[in-house]
Regions:
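Short, solvent-exposed mixed-charge patches
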Residues: 273-274
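N-terminal mature ectodomain segment of secretory-pathway/periplasmic proteins
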Residues: 27, 34-125
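Gly/Pro-enriched, hydrophobic low-complexity segments
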Residues: 108, 118-122, 128-132, 137-154, ...
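Surface-exposed beta-loop interaction hotspot
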Residues: 153-159, 166
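Bacterial N-terminal signal peptides that target proteins for export
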Residues: 2-12
Length: 274
């Protein structure tokens, strides 16, 4: 999805009114004079749009492109279980199907709020489950431009928030909110997220490394609505501004409320994932 920030005379006039207009759309949303409260409220509204999904299954194509334009592709499945305990995070599992050299590799994540997320990987070549250290979650996941922590559930309580501005993002209007991780061992000092003010879905996230230097940008596209309630982006594009590499994730075959249970998200189930 492209983002056009060029302002015509008309859109410039509209932009000057955006904070007031966005506030009017959400009567309970704190005003621009309360940037921290406003930023957190936007995150809470976004989170609320996804409550009650139960569980999901989907398939994904991962396209890796290096700085020379060389491309490699991987196929995997992604399962998620909503945690009924609202004080804790969701559970997820990723299973690689292609290419042959990574087939059967699987990662299990238990997301938490401020406690370190728990992550394990099953490596078929070694026939064992390996726990991923909390201090290593800023590293690249399976050679992609996504870090291990990027695949963890983005719980509201993991961050502090500060609303920066409202501005046009493509044909939409977006709230621009700075997030700073409250949990240990993040690879990011902060991220800046663009969330549309209509459906409250993420449109773009810019990541800054621990030294506060621009690191990478994630854009979301091809949103589709499921069960008349749950929005899912079918394409994610991550660009690393340092390595000049990119990773594209293309999602398909989303299914909701399939009957997955906690028994499908254990270390033993990692070994059985095929």
């Amino acid at each position: 999805m492209s983002f056009n920030f060029k302002l015509t005379h008309l859109s410039l006039a509209a932009a000057l009114l955006l904070p007031m207009a966005a506030w009017a759309e959400r009567p309970g949303l704190p005003g621009p004079d309360q940037p921290e409260a406003r930023g957190k409220a936007i995150a809470e509204i976004t989170d609320a749009t996804n409550l009650g999904f139960g569980d999901t299954t989907s398939e994904m194509e991962m396209i890796l492109t290096n700085a020379n334009g060389d491309v490699s592709e991987r196929r995997l499945r992604f399962n998620t279980l909503e945690n009924k305990d609202v004080t804790d995070g969701d559970w997820s599992m990723m299973i690689f199907d292609e290419p042959a050299d990574v087939a059967g590799t699987a990662m299990l994540t238990y997301a938490h709020i401020l406690d370190p997320d728990e992550q394990w990987m099953y490596l078929p070549a070694l026939k064992r489950v390996k726990r991923i250290s909390s201090v290593n979650k800023s590293g690249p996941f399976m050679g992609s431009e996504f870090a291990f922590e990027d695949f963890s559930s983005q719980e509201v309580g993991k961050y502090s928030y500060k609303w920066l501005r409202d501005e046009p993002c493509g044909e939409l209007t977006c709230h621009v909110v700075e997030r700073r991780p409250l949990y240990q061992y993040s690879g990011y000092k902060r991220t800046v997220a663009w969330t549309d003010s209509t459906d409250y879905q993420s449109r773009k996230v810019v990541y800054y490394d621990r030294k506060d230097a621009l690191l990478k940008t994630l854009t979301f596209g091809d949103y589709q609505l499921y069960l008349d309630k749950y929005w899912r982006a079918h394409e994610l594009f991550m660009e690393n501004h340092v390595t000049k590499k990119t990773t594209t994730l293309r999602w398909e075959d989303y299914a909701f409320q399939t009957g997955l249970t906690a028994e499908d998200f254990t270390q033993n189930s990692l070994k059985r994932a095929r």
